[in-house]
Amino acid sequence: MELHEISKLDNKKHPERIVESKMKKRMKPYSLTSLNNLDDGCLMHILSFLSPIPDRYNTALVCHRWRYLACHPRLWLRVDRFVKDLSQPGVFLNIESAVSAARPGDTILIVAGGNYRVSNIQIKKPLCLVGGGEIPDETTLVCARGSDSALELLSTCKLANLTVKAELGCCLLHRSGRLTIDGCVLQCETNPLDHLSCPIVSTAGDEDIENILSHVEVKETVTGKIKANSVTVLQTRIEGGAKAVSTRGDLVLQRVRVMYSKAYLYFWFDVDYE
């Protein structure tokens, strides 16, 4: 029996295959075209229902328009201490409630104006915290006296355009993950016990990895991915404290650059494995 006759017999036995293949051919271009015909507001509303990682991240790879909409500030969570109408979705009075409600990959915009009280806020998922002012000084996080830190970071996180102030403690306590500090101001209040305070403290190291691997069996190739602890500081003012950064794990200070201005010092450096 010839091949084309065999295919005909197969199609007679399974006619649903023909229908399914035709539907796929019709649906794919049609569905994509229909989505592209939506206006920006409607498409952005649809994207807001997607989880930031990995769904919204994947949609940002489709085209320039989808990338613009998937990363638009309207999809960010917002912290506004002056807001009166809390019925608005994604708006919070304080940073702690915003961090608690955030999904992995979310960006939290902290509205400029006034001081936000923070104390030992743990961040256990990948987040980005951004100050809403023109300069970092317009958005200030103040750590209560007696607290260990303003923010305790246990996952990959980025802080941008923020001022963080602390007294008798540290501004940022880095436990694990990749921390990026971009264009911020870290200040430790000057006092007689200045040696007890430090803007950045990192305790990340091999102990964290060993604790994980002792409970979970993983391949050697995965170990390198788990070992992903680091701190990257970019164009950041650091003031007060015994020293800019204190490392109590296996990370060490590397690639330090300092730019002197009339009033401030701006730092670039990495805290990473040797």
UniProtKB/Swiss-Prot annotation:
Subunit structure: Part of a SCF (SKP1-cullin-F-box) protein ligase complex. Interacts with SKP1A/ASK1.
The protein's annotated pathway: Protein modification; protein ubiquitination
Annotated source species: Arabidopsis thaliana
Name of the protein in its database record: F-box protein SKIP5
Keywords from the UniProt entry: Ubl conjugation pathway
GO biological process, one term: protein ubiquitination
UniProt keyword Nucleotide-binding present: no
Listed SUPFAM superfamilies: F-box domain, Pectin lyase-like
Occurrences of domain F-box (ranges): 32-79
Superkingdom of origin organism: Eukaryota
